[in-house]
Amino acid sequence: MTYQHIYNIIKKKAYFDAHQAVLIAVSGGVDSMNLLHFLHAFQAELQIRIGIAHVNHKQRPESDDEEAYLRSWAKKHAIPIYVAYFQGAFSENAARHFRYQFFEEIMQQEHYSALVTAHHADDQAETILMRLIRGSRLRHLAGIREVQPFATGQLIRPFLTVSKEELPNPFHFEDHSNDSMAYFRNRVRHHYLPDFKRENPQATQSLIALSAESRLLLQAFDDLTKGLAFHRLDCFLAQSAAVQFFLLQHYLETFPQLAIKKSQFDDLLHIIRRQKQGIYPIKNTYCLLIEKESFVIKKIIPKTDLNRESKMVSYGDPLDYGGYRFAFSGDLTDKGHDIVIPLYSLSPVTLRHRQAGDRLFLGEFSKKLRRLFIDGKFTNEQRQNAIVGEQAGVIIFVLVGDETYLRKASKHDIMLAKLYIDKLEKR
């Protein structure tokens, strides 16, 4: 197949209509050299200008020769080239992470809106087979996407519908590590996939079709559940078990750093179905937070000293704390405040958040704040943000949610002042 034939195939997909500056990832192998020659030949038709990004991994004697050739080619054709040198302990994952971080930096610094890679149809089939062998979720059988968001723009794979054998054979370098059976992809490419083809000559096309159908199925599910308030427990639990399963899967996909095992997924689903309020650790400082009416996955941010500090409000000196303004006043007739706390002492009032063992005196008995919050069915966030008012070491009030709980005064107490409280957001 000629580059003209390839151009005729991909021009209908309008990959580059929104782009002017395109960065090409070039290793020096046959696939990326095909991509470089193709995009260079059709720059005018595609209305783009191109640049080359190359990573010298320094793992083979040929690495420097590849870099030198690409620099010479770029100079001859007046194409900008950007080169990085891999650092650190080498592994497939580390090298891939380094490459894409480098590509992202160049896109941002040099104002490229698209990164283009040379993945083709055979890469897609290999990827699907690898994921099947690993036991990946259905969602991941959708395989490699032709276009996806990346850095400041998009990552485009224009050859993804073209097989390797359909590509021309330009001058290129051979990476002999591609023959090493130490790498899973190489075992799939040279052994497992050929075995499948011996059973079914159309195995590659079948795997690609499976990928396409999986993608359509997931898109249909997303379209049908779009706008569903699944964070609300009543809405989530109103769905069938099958829909709940895929809703949670879809939600977890929004947390790329949170790769959990299937057993952990099943545990999360079970916890949500139980509807028991609480904070449930997952991994990597993420947790599942179940409130009275909803659930959310969030990253746990350690409380700072500022969050934990207490403040003291003295007679005649207003103070802001926890989203409220507190005013300690001897004017017992002042009106128009959100909350009014009677004070039977002129000693300063300490404002703080709850602590283990806190109790509020309610007359003939006292109650732990923990039990008070449970009985009031307050959310975990409301409990964490609750404000405790203390005078002379005794809790005199608690603000939690939209409720205020007061210490029961004795019959001998005489009101000497009031604590006026107003929400700052109204001011």
From Swiss-Prot:
Pfam families the record matches: ATP_bind_3 (PF01171)
Main location: cytoplasm
EC number: 6.3.4.19
Any one GO cellular component localisation term in the record: cytoplasm
Gene3D superfamilies, per the entry: HUPs
Annotated catalysed reactions: cytidine(34) in tRNA(Ile2) + L-lysine + ATP = lysidine(34) in tRNA(Ile2) + AMP + diphosphate + H(+)
GO biological process: tRNA modification
EC supergroup of this enzyme: ligase
Annotated positions binding ATP: 27-32
GO MF annotation terms: ATP binding; tRNA(Ile)-lysidine synthase activity
Keywords carried by this UniProt record: ATP-binding, Cytoplasm, Ligase, Nucleotide-binding, tRNA processing
Localization of this protein: Cytoplasm
Entry superkingdom: Bacteria
Free-text function comment from the UniProt entry: Ligates lysine onto the cytidine present at position 34 of the AUA codon-specific tRNA(Ile) that contains the anticodon CAU, in an ATP-dependent manner. Cytidine is converted to lysidine, thus changing the amino acid specificity of the tRNA from methionine to isoleucine.
Entry similarity comment: Belongs to the tRNA(Ile)-lysidine synthase family.
Note on domains (UniProt): The N-terminal region contains the highly conserved SGGXDS motif, predicted to be a P-loop motif involved in ATP binding.
Record-given protein name: tRNA(Ile)-lysidine synthase
